[in-house]
């Protein structure tokens, strides 16, 4: 059987697209994040993430809690160092666990946060929550800041539930960072990276 030699450079012009999370040389550029183990803290604020350099962002990470049975919440931060609370958060997340049971998390009218989980485990071998969140237009003061997310939680019995959905805050204002907070327990371990998405 004869071999066919391919010339992969023939007919190719320009530069092939690449993506590199670590070096920031592709379509995603790391703009910030946070990582720690063995903590006992009530919240995590990550500031100075969003600017006019990028319109949209990607957040990837995981969180472990110190004790069982706590929800994990997410709020926006302003460049003044204040956390956005109030009742402007609206969201709808649809989930399915490993037994095909359906679970939904939503805000019926308005809420003071995005709720990213039910009651989670504190087992260090199982992330309480791991997630991928796309954030749209956070630095544009004339638009709402919205999210589209996929996240998975392990509950107190290490049962996995995966959610997907979206949400937004009704205020048309610019935001600077993110604020993760459990509703009843403390954070122990976390590793979060935030990337700006290049337009071209």
Where are these regions (language model features)?
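Surface-exposed molecular-recognition determinants
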Residues: 2-200
């Amino acid at each position: 059987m004869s071999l066919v030699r391919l010339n992969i450079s023939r007919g190719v012009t320009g530069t092939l697209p690449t993506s590199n999370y670590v070096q920031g040389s592709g379509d995603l550029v790391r703009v910030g994040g946070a990582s720690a183990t063995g903590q006992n803290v009530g919240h995590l604020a990550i500031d100075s993430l969003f600017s006019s350099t990028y319109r949209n962002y990607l957040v990837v990470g995981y969180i472990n809690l110190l004790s069982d049975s706590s929800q994990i919440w997410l709020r926006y931060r302003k460049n003044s160092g204040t956390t956005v609370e109030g009742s402007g958060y609206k969201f709808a997340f649809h989930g399915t666990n490993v037994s095909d049971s359906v679970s939904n998390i939503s805000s019926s009218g308005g809420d003071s946060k995005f709720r990213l989980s039910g009651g989670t485990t504190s087992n260090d071998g199982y992330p309480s929550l791991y997630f991928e969140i796309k954030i749209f237009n956070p630095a544009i003061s004339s638009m709402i800041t919205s999210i589209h997310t996929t996240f998975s939680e392990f509950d107190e019995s290490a049962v996995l539930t995966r959610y997907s959905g979206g949400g937004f805050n009704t205020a048309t204002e610019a935001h600077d960072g993110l604020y993760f907070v459990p509703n009843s327990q403390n954070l122990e371990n976390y590793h979060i990276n935030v990337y700006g998405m290049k337009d071209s």
